[in-house]
């Protein structure tokens, strides 16, 4: 007879931390230069006028203005641009 109870081991019990991806500032909203518009993996959204692309594909505003989402070209690329307020 075993003196200790056999303890099973599970191969589950791990999870990764949340990455908080997605659109942070929506179309028509005001934004300041340097603020993040979209956090993404890969370029689901492409940068347009007044928008920069970070090393991790984050889109951020280069100028103060209003955010504008559009689709362009035959590939229907979703572009984000910041229209400077006059």
Swiss-Prot record:
GO biological process, alphabetically ordered: translation
CC terms in the record's Gene Ontology section: cytosolic large ribosomal subunit
UniProt keyword annotations, A-Z: Ribonucleoprotein, Ribosomal protein
SUPFAM superfamilies found in the cross-reference section: Ribosomal L27 protein-like (SSF110324)
Domain of life where this protein originates: Bacteria
InterPro entries assigned: Ribosomal_bL27, Ribosomal_bL27_CS
Molecular-function annotations in GO: structural constituent of ribosome
Pfam families: Ribosomal_L27
Sequence similarity: Belongs to the bacterial ribosomal protein bL27 family.
Name of the protein this chain belongs to: Large ribosomal subunit protein bL27
Lineage: Bacteria, Pseudomonadati, Pseudomonadota, Gammaproteobacteria, Lysobacterales
Encoding gene, per UniProt annotation: rpmA
């Amino acid at each position: 007879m075993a003196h200790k109870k056999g303890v099973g081991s599970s191969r589950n019990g791990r999870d990764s931390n949340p990455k908080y991806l997605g659109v942070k500032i929506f179309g028509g909203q005001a934004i300041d230069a340097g603020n993040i518009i979209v956090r993404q993996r890969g370029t689901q959204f492409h940068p347009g006028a007044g928008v920069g692309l970070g090393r991790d594909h984050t889109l951020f505003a280069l100028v103060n203005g209003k955010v504008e989402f559009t689709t362009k070209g035959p590939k229907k690329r979703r572009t984000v641009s910041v229209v400077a307020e006059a």
